[in-house]
UniProtKB/Swiss-Prot annotation:
Function, in words: Chaperone involved in the maturation of iron-sulfur cluster-containing proteins. Has a low intrinsic ATPase activity which is markedly stimulated by HscB.
SUPFAM superfamilies: Actin-like ATPase domain (SSF53067), Heat shock protein 70kD (HSP70), C-terminal subdomain (SSF100934), Heat shock protein 70kD (HSP70), peptide-binding domain (SSF100920)
Protein name (record): Chaperone protein HscA homolog
Keyword set, alphabetical order: ATP-binding, Chaperone, Nucleotide-binding
Length: 621
């Protein structure tokens, strides 16, 4: 939120001065910048009045760059040095982009994130994105006539921490102060909710160039609450283009193709897809380097048939998000469409059929995200007028937890928790004299650490030596408004503390988040059995270790037969704990516990006598 500057009465400086902040939709295919002028959000155009900036950057041998429309026009003749859809590479490792078989780029494996070899040197996705953001920043400053105090930049709801951090790094490289990263569907909700003063439950169906997001929102007076999110980080309009490209290649029998021909046909495929949004057929014409001529007629029926699986692929996350929110399709009052790909008639029909109502198309689906981001930026800059206050509650898509003994996961912040959020939980030591604790930060829905995604590991050292279970370690998870996580561990007696900010070296592979959620539900019963087994084994280990230590220190309190009986119980627990029956392990643990009750009582008597030895009765009063 904006800081308020307090002046003496009657001495308020520049009472009508506004702080200039913008909203930026950093898209896979196109990017936009918008600002609030006279309380109305509007997209800022370039010198020709064009709102969209193609998210394309071409690198030249003299290390200069062409950005936007010019780069897009030059992509066909210089595909290796013209980077398109860079958003798909943000926060990704080499293995995550290896499936892009039609990509013309020379990828370089580098620590943290894949990079791309160009004539101007090796470039990271962060650097490429920074070129786009810098162009939008300059456009905004030219339009508004002053420097910006910051920007709200939108990201897909399913961007993980690595991808979000990469976006913030790109903004800083472009000279932009990031006021907040905002989920794209949430930005659309801001634009639609405030424009129409609507209340109720809404679905935001966002099919952009490279990602698909679905958000279920509850809009009430002054409050935007995200009930659930879902989506596919590797599904977008580009995939429809790719499928159409494959169809063109198949129909024309064109194999193999040069990178330049591939890029030319991709441009033709995209143009044909867009033409079908206005008519029921179009002609695809192209002349290749080899002299071959491509001339094909594409009808909407053919296009719908070859892309039907992609349309259906978007509906699976929709069903999941509705289940998570606890609502049915007929409870949804309206469906907001976001992203240029939602102009496809097949998408609009599928969404309408699923929800039983035509989707809302009041606002331009290409612009709605930027408009919502501009409104949020205006608010964060402190420019809102009385009565314009509203609250935005966003959520995290995957649970965050910590590994405990036995390889179990203790969830600290469950998925779909509203952010920003901070949650803390206390843990203790497992062994006597334990002076350090390893903290393993995890992300996912499974019960075992081995089935979740590892985000970070760090150690808390300097814990005072105590008996097992006496130390108190408070672990705090804090997720900021941008979805970035920091974890702090503090021993409450001594005050020793350690922390980590989670910036993973690279993001989740395509479809990993959706897969993790699906596995969490599919394997729930198996996971609970595995968790029960692990918990009983941990309890068995704890009791066996404690009883063994007790025999070492106070074994003289038992007769030879009594000691042999206890040792037999210990051996039985150890053997049964190697099995898979958690009920049997629990029974064995309870038998050992009952079998050592008398031993525990004798140890307690000895401890009390030792504590009272040599002390007078008066001292005890």
């Amino acid at each position: 939120m904006a800081l308020l500057q307090i002046s003496e009465p009657g001495m308020s400086p520049a009472p009508h001065q506004r702080r200039l902040a913008v909203g930026i939709d950093l898209g896979t295919t196109n990017s936009l910048v918008a600002a609030v002028r006279n309380s109305i959000p509007e997209v800022l155009g370039d010198e020709r009045g064009r709102a969209l900036l193609p998210s394309v950057v071409r690198y030249l041998p003299d290390r200069t760059t062409h950005i936007g429309y010019r780069a897009q026009d030059e992509a066909v003749r210089d595909p290796k040095n013209t980077i398109v859809s860079v958003k798909r590479f943000m926060g990704r490792g080499l293995k995550d982009v290896a499936h892009n078989e039609h990509s013309p780029y020379d990828f370089v494996d580098a620590p943290g994130m894949v990079q791309i070899k160009t004539v101007a040197g090796v470039k990271s996705p962060v650097e490429v994105s920074a070129e786009i953001l810098a162009t939008l920043r300059q456009r905004a400053e030219d339009s508004l006539g002053d420097d910006l105090v910051g920007a709200v930049i939108t990201v897909p709801a399913y961007f993980d921490e690595a991808q979000r951090q990469a976006t913030k790094d790109a903004a800083r490289l472009a000279g932009l102060e990031v006021l907040r990263l905002l989920n794209e569907p949430t930005a659309a909700a801001i634009a639609y909710g405030l424009d129409n003063a609507s209340e109720g439950i809404y679905a935001v169906y966002d099919l952009g160039g490279g990602t698909f997001d679905i958000s279920i929102l509850k809009l009430t007076k002054g409050v935007f609450e995200v009930l659930s999110t879902g989506g596919d980080s590797a599904l977008g309009g580009d995939d429809f283009d790719q499928r159409l490209l494959c169809w063109i290649v198949e129909q024309a029998g064109l194999q193999p193709l040069s990178a330049q021909d591939m890029r030319l046909l991709m441009v033709r495929a995209r143009a044909a897809k867009e033409a079908l949004s206005e008519g029921d057929s179009t002609v695809i014409d192209a002349v290749l380097d080899s002299g071959e001529i491509v001339h094909l007629t594409l009808t909407d029926e053919i296009f719908d048939t070859i892309t039907a699986h992609l349309v259906q692929k978007t509906l699976a996350p929709v069903r999941k998000a509705l289940r998570d929110a606890g609502v049915t399709p007929d409870e949804v009052q309206g469906v907001v469409l976001v992203g240029g790909a939602t102009r496809m008639p097949a998408i609009r029909k599928a969404v309408g059929d699923f929800f039983g109502q035509p989707p809302l198309t009041n606002l331009d689906p290409d612009r709605v995200v930027a408009l919502g981001a501009a409104m949020q930026a205006n608010l964060l800059a402190g420019n809102h007028a009385p009565g314009e206050d509203w609250l935005l509650l966003d959520v995290i898509p995957l649970s965050l937890g910590v590994e405990t003994m036995g390889g179990l996961v203790e969830k600290i912040i469950p998925r779909n928790s509203t952010i920003p959020v901070a949650r803390a939980q206390e843990f203790t030591t497992f062994k006597d004299g334990q002076t350090a604790m390893a903290i393993h930060v995890l992300q996912g829905e499974r019960e075992l650490a081995s089935d979740c995604r590892s985000l970070a590991r760090f150690e808390l050292r300097g814990i005072p030596p105590m008996v097992a279970g006496a130390a108190r370690i408070r672990v705090t998870y804090q997720v900021d408004a941008d979805g970035l996580l920091s974890v702090t561990a503090r021993e409450t007696h001594s005050g020793v503390e350690s922390s980590v900010t989670v910036k993973p070296s690279y993001g989740l592979a395509d479809d990993d988040i959706a897969r993790m959620l699906q596995e969490g539900f599919r394997e729930a019963e198996h996971d609970m059995k595995s968790r029960a087994l692990a918990e009983e084994r941990v309890e068995a280990d704890r009791l066996v270790e404690a009883t063994t230590r007790a025999l070492e220190t106070d074994g003289d309190l038992l007769s030879a037969d009594e000691r042999a009986a206890v040792e037999a119980l210990i051996a039985s627990v150890r053997e049964i704990a190697t099995g898979e029956d958690h009920h049997a392990i629990k029974a064995a643990v309870e038998t050992l516990s009952r079998g050592t009750d008398e031993f525990a009582a004798r140890r307690m008597d000895r401890s009390i006598k030792s504590a009272l030895a040599g002390r007078k009765v008066q001292e005890l009063g």
